[in-house]
Amino acid sequence: MLKVIEYDGNLKEIAQKLNNRKEEISIEVNNAVNDIINDIRKNGNQALINYCRKFDGYQIKDENDFVVSNQEKEEALKQVDQDYIRILERTKQQITEFHKNQIDKSWSLYKDNGVIMGQMVRPIERVALYVPGGTAAYPSTVLMNAIPAKLAGVKDLVIITPVKADGKVNPVIVAAAKVSGVDTIYKFGGAQGVAAIANGTETIEKVDKIVGPGNIFVATAKKLSYGVVDIDMVAGPSEVLVIADENANPKYIAADLMSQAEHDKLASAMLVTTSKELAEKVNVELKRQMAYLSRKEIIEESLQNYGGAILVKDLKEAFEVSNYLAPEHLEVLVEKPVNTLPYIKNAGSIFLGEYSPEPLGDYMSGTNHVLPTGGTAKFYSALGVYDFVKYSSYSYYPKDVLETFKDDVQTFAKSEGLDAHANSIAVRFEEE
């Protein structure tokens, strides 16, 4: 179970181990994805059709089969239970309530001398949301990405998702798209899907940004497409860090640690506590609860390789550990947890108290579950409305005000060897 480690002020080894969990992008994968991107750029629709047939087994006839038709949507929605639709709608309300507070506004500054300056906030025009295919469906991914984009004002939001050989998109993905207000769903994914939507083809309009999770080929395609389009982030394996005092409930802690460990064998679940007795009780609970969970083997390997219980002398040290590791998810199970917020510097998303478990955040708390991993919470943020807008500054200067700056600007420009810059100012004050 969790290996108990006494904190001695040195976390470099632990941090390095956690941050190295990302799958290395091998030369082979990189080259393969590069070839796919170049093929799509050169051969467009036909290359995409070939890859759909090769990788997904979807015997697509022509480019008309790229998009989920209205009839296909109607048939898919009939397969989704109405109570599930209710849950999606409730989740949408929660996400909207939180994220609407992130909406930024344009502003202007009018000075007495006639100068006008300001900043315009404008939505990104066209965005693609990648939704993983396969046996598992992730409608929460649709909601978490689409709703902030819609609140930002993105008018053209599309989904790309791989399909099986039958060419069908999972019905719950169709339902989530409808609830989120996404009308266009493309039936392709993988590196080829990213390449097609990033570069465009004869019938597919290129986007300005791609968001959403995917496998190593999707992640590589997104990285290689950055600059042609914007991307959200390239996330690594999931992680949770729980800070707990001696009064925390070991049953809850064990359950929350396993909720992350079940994602995959590279997931990390760490406990930081002031109580060795609590750590021991958590290990007992892990064994007990794990016995009846379907992903027991994955959980066990994850906890063994990337789990641990770090013993600290006080909560000050606990937050020192947490801020250094900068976890994707941080749970704080101590007395008066809300009062600890000033001590938290680096965390993707924070869950305060015993009744705010991380899985609530995965689905329905309203906060976003697209989060920085691998220590990148030190400089990255959770996905939000701000990821779907751009900022343009503007300025208006009357001639008489420019004249008060002309000598200084020319001197500055010449000091950098940019005579044409200086000339641009000078010509405006030459006598005709």
Regions found by a protein language model. Give the residues of each.
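N-terminal Rossmann-like NAD(P)+-binding subdomain of aldehyde/semialdehyde dehydrogenases
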Residues: 1-125
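Short loop-to-beta-strand entry elements in the cores of soluble alpha/beta enzymes
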Residues: 213, 233-244, 260-283, 299-310, ...
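Short acidic-hydrophobic, aromatic-tinged amphipathic segments that line or gate anion-handling sites
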Residues: 2-9, 184-189, 309-314
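Conserved NAD(P)+-binding/catalytic subdomain of aldehyde/semialdehyde dehydrogenases
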Residues: 181-252, 256-259, 263-268
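Short internal beta-strands
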Residues: 155-164, 269-275, 353
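Conserved small-residue-rich beta-alpha loop and adjacent elements
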Residues: 109-175
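C-terminal core of ALDH-fold dehydrogenases
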Residues: 324-432
